[in-house]
Each structure stands twice: as structure tokens, then as C-alpha cells.
Amino acid sequence: MAVIKIKPTSPGQRGAVKISRDHLYKGEAFAGLLEPQFQKAGRNNNGHITTRHKGGGHKHHYRVVDFRRNKDAIPAKVERIEYDPNRTAHIALVCYADGERRYIIAPRNLEVGATIVSGSEAPIRVGNTLPIRNIPVGSTIHCIELKPGAGAQIARSAGTSATLLAREGVYAQVRMRSGEVRKIHIECRATIGEVANEEHSLRQLGKAGVKRWMGIRPTVRGVAMNPIDHPHGGGEGRTGEGRHAVDPWGNLTKGYRTRNNKRTQVMIVSRRKK
């Protein structure tokens, strides 16, 4: 992959930095794994805004990605690597020996034509999925389950990975990209390697319109609103908040802890590093 610096032919192009997709498949996505995706624009069934700053954006189909990788002991051949508009990672179309095709998250260095396999007897090779109890300590892994059989939930974004630190009894300790160390059941599955498209973080959008293509609407500052719309609103001329920073509903926003101490708190060995 390469980083593409755009010629400054306009203000929007001047700061834009794109990631090359020359190595990706150029054709249409596999129709058997596409589903319609209806845009809600952040509204619920009453038409009320439940998530701000959403709306518009380019239409696209949802690619059904296999996060469970539960087709054990059946080898699959990588047919192509594709762009997925629904996520930062690339996806790979694999064809199993019995003819079934599935999309998976594409790991780094996975080549077209490579063979991957899932199951407890799978070799330790990039793209293979195994229970954590069968993965050597110190391995780099991604697409990690939190509950056995529930499907991957951790380390699915572009360039992300985690490290298997230790195994104690029925739990393993895994260090996340954030620095958090968490206990995960050894029967949970994980995939060897790290997620591809690691240069995604170098991308520069260049102009506000790119955000609109993504379905993200502008975020207006509270001090620029009227007092009926935000606690920071109102005043003559340019004024500050006049109080501690709050959200539109009056809740503190700076230095205020929002995480609930859920029952899964006991699974965190070490909190994430700031």
C-alpha cells in the first residue's frame, strides 16, 4: 500500500492524503453476501433524533462478514481482497473446499491464493482462527471473541491487533491496542496476525464534503446556539460558557466519568493507558 499526496489544485485537495487501493479487487462485490442497508439518519421510529450529527452520505450495501469463523477443518482459498465501505479494514472473499464463500476481515500480509483454515488443529499462520488455548503465548492476534461462539468483537479495525500475554486456568490475559489488559476465556477464538490497511490512520480527508459523503453532519458549538438549544447558548456578542462545560442536556462533559462499573469489570486486569 502507498500513501497518495494529491496535487494542490484546490483548497480541498491541498491537504488531502489518500491511501492507494491499487492492490484491491476492482470489480463488484460478491452478490450472495450483500444485504440492503437502510439509512435512519440518526432517527428512531418516532422520527426523533436519537444520535446527533448523522444523515445523508453515499448509499452502499452491507457486506456480510463472518466473525465466527466456525467452519472448522475445511480449508478455504483467498479469492480476492476488497474494499468495504462499512469499515476501515479491508475484507477478503474466501472460497471453502465445499464451495461456500464467505467474507472475512483481511489480515496484514494475507495474499490472494493463500489457504486459511479454522479450528483447534489449525497451524499457527496468518489468517487462521483457533481457540485461544491453542495459540502460543506472545502471539499477535485480532478478531477476538469475548464469549465463546459469539463472534469476534475486539481488534477488528484497520491496523489493530492484540497480544496474548499469559494463560491461567480457564482464562487468558490479552493486552489490547489501548494498553488495557483483559481476561478472556480460553475457548474464545482469535485470528493470527493483525488487521490489514494499517496506513488508514495516515489518511487526511482534505475537505468537509468528505465527511458528508460518509454520512456525518456538522457539529455546532454550544456557545454558537441560542439558550433554548444549549446551556452554553445566548449572550451578547462573543461570550464563553459562563459555567463548567456541559452537553446539551446539562451533563458535565470534562473530567466526568461515564463508564458504568458493569459485571465485566472483574475481567479487566489493568486499565487502558492514557
UniProtKB/Swiss-Prot annotation:
<dbReference type="InterPro" id="IPR005880">
    <property type="entry name" value="Ribosomal_uL2_bac/org-type"/>
</dbReference>
<dbReference type="GO" id="GO:0003735">
    <property type="term" value="F:structural constituent of ribosome"/>
</dbReference>
<dbReference type="InterPro" id="IPR022666">
    <property type="entry name" value="Ribosomal_uL2_RNA-bd_dom"/>
</dbReference>
<protein>
    <recommendedName>
        <fullName>Large ribosomal subunit protein uL2</fullName>
    </recommendedName>
</protein>
<comment type="similarity">
    <text>Belongs to the universal ribosomal protein uL2 family.</text>
</comment>
<dbReference type="GO" id="GO:0016740">
    <property type="term" value="F:transferase activity"/>
</dbReference>
<keyword id="KW-0699">rRNA-binding</keyword>
<dbReference type="GO" id="GO:0015934">
    <property type="term" value="C:large ribosomal subunit"/>
</dbReference>
<dbReference type="InterPro" id="IPR008991">
    <property type="entry name" value="Translation_prot_SH3-like_sf"/>
</dbReference>
<dbReference type="GO" id="GO:0019843">
    <property type="term" value="F:rRNA binding"/>
</dbReference>
<comment type="function">
    <text>One of the primary rRNA binding proteins. Required for association of the 30S and 50S subunits to form the 70S ribosome, for tRNA binding and peptide bond formation. It has been suggested to have peptidyltransferase activity; this is somewhat controversial. Makes several contacts with the 16S rRNA in the 70S ribosome.</text>
</comment>
<keyword id="KW-0689">Ribosomal protein</keyword>
<dbReference type="InterPro" id="IPR014726">
    <property type="entry name" value="Ribosomal_uL2_dom3"/>
</dbReference>
<dbReference type="InterPro" id="IPR022671">
    <property type="entry name" value="Ribosomal_uL2_CS"/>
</dbReference>
<feature type="compositionally biased region" description="Basic and acidic residues">
    <location>
        <begin position="229"/>
        <end position="246"/>
    </location>
</feature>
<dbReference type="GO" id="GO:0002181">
    <property type="term" value="P:cytoplasmic translation"/>
</dbReference>
<dbReference type="InterPro" id="IPR022669">
    <property type="entry name" value="Ribosomal_uL2_C"/>
</dbReference>
<keyword id="KW-0687">Ribonucleoprotein</keyword>
<dbReference type="Pfam" id="PF03947">
    <property type="entry name" value="Ribosomal_L2_C"/>
</dbReference>
<dbReference type="InterPro" id="IPR002171">
    <property type="entry name" value="Ribosomal_uL2"/>
</dbReference>
<keyword id="KW-0694">RNA-binding</keyword>
<dbReference type="Pfam" id="PF00181">
    <property type="entry name" value="Ribosomal_L2"/>
</dbReference>
<feature type="region of interest" description="Disordered">
    <location>
        <begin position="224"/>
        <end position="256"/>
    </location>
</feature>
<comment type="subunit">
    <text>Part of the 50S ribosomal subunit. Forms a bridge to the 30S subunit in the 70S ribosome.</text>
</comment>
<dbReference type="InterPro" id="IPR014722">
    <property type="entry name" value="Rib_uL2_dom2"/>
</dbReference>
<dbReference type="InterPro" id="IPR012340">
    <property type="entry name" value="NA-bd_OB-fold"/>
</dbReference>
